Each structure stands twice: as structure tokens, then as C-alpha cells.
């Protein structure tokens, strides 16, 4: 099979990549963060390339994509592609919540209720969970139905993360 050469010059691009990770990262290099480019981060992180996904999600989050903010929180909260950083994870959740994202509201509500990455505030945390539930987020409704028992929505394998540090 012959190698295809891509040439960029003042007249345009000969044989441009029109799909795949090459296009995604060329888009990022050129400051293009569209929904298709940002959604590719899911496949990248699920393939175990967390540092690469982190680069993509961070650019998309900075461009205002709340789904990418949620993914940045997940990466920081689990030490994927970087250090475990609950403060950074909570900050991404807060940004998504402030942007009006129901998942961001739910996640930041959990952060506040647990005091994970932020100062604990049960009242504000419940209020955010309630907003997410009102907006139709089923897991938020489930937490309300369990009288805000966090074990309802959190695997017990994660309990070590949420234990007090003192």
C-alpha cells in the first residue's frame, strides 16, 4: 500500500485527514474544539490513554464543554493521566454546575455533602442535588429517594476516598 502524503501550503491541504485521532489532535493544535472532537476523548480514555484524554478534555473544558469538565473531574478524582487531586476534581464539578449542567450540579452536590475537595456543606450540597433532580437527572432523584444516603449512589469500594483525613 502506498503512503499518503499530506501537504499543507497557502493553497490548502492536499490529502487532509478527515477522521481519526490524527484529525482530533490537529484540531486541538489549531484551537478547534467542536463537539465531535471533544466526544472523541471518551474513546481515548476508555482505551487507557488517560494523559492524551486529559489534554483533549482540558482544552474542551476550557472552551466551555461541560461534559469535558465532568471527565476532567473523573480523571482528577481517580488519578488517571495525572495525580489524584480531589480539589481539582471538585473545581471541575463546580465549573460544570455553575455552567448549568445537571450532572455537574449533582457531582458538585456530592462533593459538598462529603467535603471531598471542598469544605463540607450539606445544605448547599443537597440544594444542588435537588436542582439536578428537578432538571430530570435520575440518579439525583434516586439520592433524594434514599434521604440523601450517599451509599445509595457510591460504590463502597470508594469509601476510602471520602473518609475524613484526621
Predicted regions span which residues?
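Structural signature of tandem alpha-helical TPR/SEL1-like repeats
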Residues: 14-19, 46-55, 82-92, 119-128, ...
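Alpha-helical segment of the N-proximal tetratricopeptide repeat
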Residues: 30-59, 63
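Hydrophobic face of amphipathic alpha-helices that form TPR/SEL1-like repeat modules
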Residues: 37-44, 69-78, 105-114, 143-150
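Residue-level recognition of tetratricopeptide repeat
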Residues: 65-67, 101, 137-139
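Terminal, low-structured helical/coil segments at or just beyond the last alpha-helical repeat
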Residues: 133, 139-166
Amino acid at each position: 500500500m502506498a503512503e499518503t502524503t499530506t501537504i499543507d501550503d497557502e493553497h490548502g491541504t492536499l490529502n487532509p485527514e478527515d477522521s481519526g485521532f490524527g484529525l482530533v489532535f490537529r484540531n486541538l493544535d489549531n484551537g478547534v474544539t467542536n463537539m465531535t472532537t471533544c466526544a472523541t476523548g471518551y474513546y481515548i480514555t476508555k482505551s487507557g490513554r488517560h494523559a492524551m484524554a486529559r489534554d483533549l478534555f482540558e482544552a474542551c473544558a476550557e472552551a466551555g464543554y461541560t461534559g469535558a469538565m465532568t471527565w476532567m473531574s473523573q480523571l482528577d478524582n481517580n488519578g488517571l493521566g495525572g495525580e489524584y487531586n480531589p480539589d481539582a476534581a471538585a473545581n471541575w464539578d463546580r465549573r460544570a454546575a455553575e455552567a448549568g449542567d445537571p450532572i455537574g450540579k449533582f457531582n458538585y452536590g456530592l462533593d459538598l455533602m462529603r467535603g471531598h475537595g471542598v469544605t463540607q456543606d450539606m445544605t448547599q450540597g443537597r440544594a444542588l442535588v435537588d436542582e439536578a433532580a428537578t432538571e430530570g437527572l435520575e440518579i439525583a432523584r434516586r439520592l433524594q429517594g434514599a434521604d440523601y444516603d450517599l451509599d445509595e449512589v457510591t460504590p463502597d469500594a470508594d469509601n476510602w476516598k471520602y473518609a475524613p483525613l484526621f
